[in-house]
Amino acid sequence: MVIGLSHYLTVSAILFTLGVFGIFLNRKNVIVILMSVELILLSVNINMVAFSHFLNDIVGQVFALFILTVAAAEAAIGLAILVVFYRNRGSIAVEDVNMMKG
């Protein structure tokens, strides 16, 4: 059995849908929202690498590596902000984020 472009796009669509559902169904926990955003970015990367492979163009793979780097930095900064927020407020609920106003 040959794994074609449609298989990669199906996996990517499933990951993207899970990420969107994770954002919209769980509005309480910031960590789950961050993980859902990472799932969405991963699905975009799978699309880029799959199209890059099947079109014999390396630009998509290079851009996917760039997106992975930015996503790792985004996750590190987001988790650092969550740690500081938890130390100050004692919770990481999304409802408490509006209390961060000056």
Curated annotation (Swiss-Prot):
Its EC number is 7.1.1.-. Gene3D superfamilies: 1.10.287.3510. It is an enzyme of class 7 (translocase). One of its GO terms (molecular function) is NADH:ubiquinone reductase (non-electrogenic) activity. The chain crosses the membrane at residues 5-25, 31-51, 65-85. It catalyses: a quinone + NADH + 5 H(+)(in) = a quinol + NAD(+) + 4 H(+)(out). GO terms for biological process: ATP synthesis coupled electron transport. It is found in: Cell inner membrane. It is a multi-pass membrane protein. InterPro entries: NADH_UbQ_OxRdtase_chain4L/K, NUOK/Mnh_C1-like. One of its GO terms (cellular component) is NADH dehydrogenase complex. Keywords: Cell inner membrane, Cell membrane, Membrane, NAD, Quinone, Translocase, Transmembrane, Transmembrane helix, Transport, Ubiquinone. It holds the Pfam family Oxidored_q2. Belongs to the complex I subunit 4L family. HAMAP family: NDH1_NuoK. NDH-1 shuttles electrons from NADH, via FMN and iron-sulfur (Fe-S) centers, to quinones in the respiratory chain. The immediate electron acceptor for the enzyme in this species is believed to be ubiquinone. Couples the redox reaction to proton translocation (for every two electrons transferred, four hydrogen ions are translocated across the cytoplasmic membrane), and thus conserves the redox energy in a proton gradient. NDH-1 is composed of 14 different subunits. Subunits NuoA, H, J, K, L, M, N constitute the membrane sector of the complex. This is NADH-quinone oxidoreductase subunit K 1. The lineage of its organism: Bacteria, Pseudomonadati, Pseudomonadota, Alphaproteobacteria, Hyphomicrobiales. The gene is nuoK1.
